[in-house]
Design a protein with these regions (language model features):
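Conserved ABC ATPase signature
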Residues: 102, 142-146
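Catalytic Walker B motif of ABC-type/P-loop ATPase nucleotide-binding domains
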Residues: 167-170
């Protein structure tokens, strides 16, 4: 499987670029030959199971780890050469809560602002951040008394306090309920609209739908990068169209359908009346499928594009990788 993004798309508008990026700890390869780029102003989702190398990759991109081999550029520079001013263009939300439990929400945010040298007249910005993460009414509450979701929101506010250009968010929605996870993605979309670029790691495969580009990571290797829709199409070989006919389709008719130029691969039998086919473009193929059914004297009850969940997409990608050795 091709794990590289097209190098022809590497431009000055990419805030992250890597080439054959590899990190080994002794004989253990944590990240292997990573090739990717992150365009400015996009949300790049980095998806994969726990332990696949997502956090390690983030630590490479932020300069915490030095690569064993390969090259990388973040905001036009190697992280090893970052100055203090360069680092202040980054925001990094780590998985653990690292703010001070005995300080209030406001005190924690104010301390983070002072650490980054934000103007002493920063009250207005801090208030806006608390409002953004919906913690204004909890400003005087000690951090140790916050719920897990509130702690994640406070951590996000602290990550944003210096208005960084590029945000690395490592498992920002881990361990929180689905409603709050959706709220976080609403935050991320707002940050994108404000001009920020976001690199978000997650093991919740369904969150791919919120991203502009998605990289699928597995066992230290980047399997593919595509848009959410492109990910589905690459996993299944095109769009899936479900056809339900009144009479049911015979074996010979299925064989004839597979021979049509707009159909790829085998027809999948769902039941006696329903079959799924893979096509290039569902919108273009559906009229042709209806016409074919008419020539076969099959009465179409329903015909529609099917959208498999991203959990199924991820499983399919892993199966493809296993089949390719």
């Amino acid at each position: 499987m091709n794990d590289n993004q097209n190098n022809n798309n590497q431009t000055a508008e990419n805030v992250v670029e890597t080439k054959d990026l590899t990190l080994s700890f002794g004989e253990d390869v944590a990240v292997q030959s990573l090739n990717m780029y992150v365009p400015r102003g996009k949300i790049f989702g980095f998806i994969g199971p726990s332990g696949c190398g997502k956090t390690t990759t983030v630590r490479l991109l932020t300069g915490f780890y030095k690569p064993t081999s390969g090259t990388l550029s973040v905001l036009g520079k190697n992280p090893a050469d970052f100055t203090k001013a360069d680092r202040e263009k980054l925001g990094y939300l780590i998985q653990q809560f690292v703010l001070y439990p005995d300080l209030t929400v406001w005190e924690n945010l104010n301390f983070a602002a002072s650490f980054y040298g934000v103007s002493p007249f920063r009250g207005k910005r801090l208030n806006k951040l608390l409002e953004f993460v919906e913690l204004s009414e909890h400003r005087n509450k000690l951090a140790r008394d916050l719920s897990g979701g509130m702690k994640r929101r406070l951590s996000l506010a602290a990550t944003m306090v210096h208005n960084p250009e590029l945000l690395f968010l490592d498992e920002p929605t881990a361990g929180i309920d689905p409603i709050l996870r959706r709220k976080f993605w609403d935050y991320f979309k707002e940050l994108q609209e404000q001009g920020h670029t976001l690199f978000v790691t997650t093991q919740y495969v369904g969150e791919a739908a919120y991203c502009d580009l998605v990289g699928v990571m597995y066992e230290g290797r980047l399997l593919m990068v595509a848009s959410p829709e492109g990910l589905r199409r690459r996993a299944f070989g095109g769009d899936i169209v479900g056809i339900k006919t009144t009479e049911g389709m015979s074996y010979d008719q299925r064989h004839q359908l597979e021979a049509q130029p707009f159909v790829h691969g085998k027809v999948k039998v769902i039941d006696e009346q329903e079959n799924d086919v893979i096509v290039d473009e569902a919108s273009a193929a559906i009229p042709a499928l209806i016409e074919w059914c008419q020539t076969q004297k099959l009465n179409v009850e329903t015909i529609e594009e099917k959208t498999p969940p991203y959990d199924d997409v991820f499983v399919k990608i892993i199966e493809m990788e296993a089949a390719n050795g």
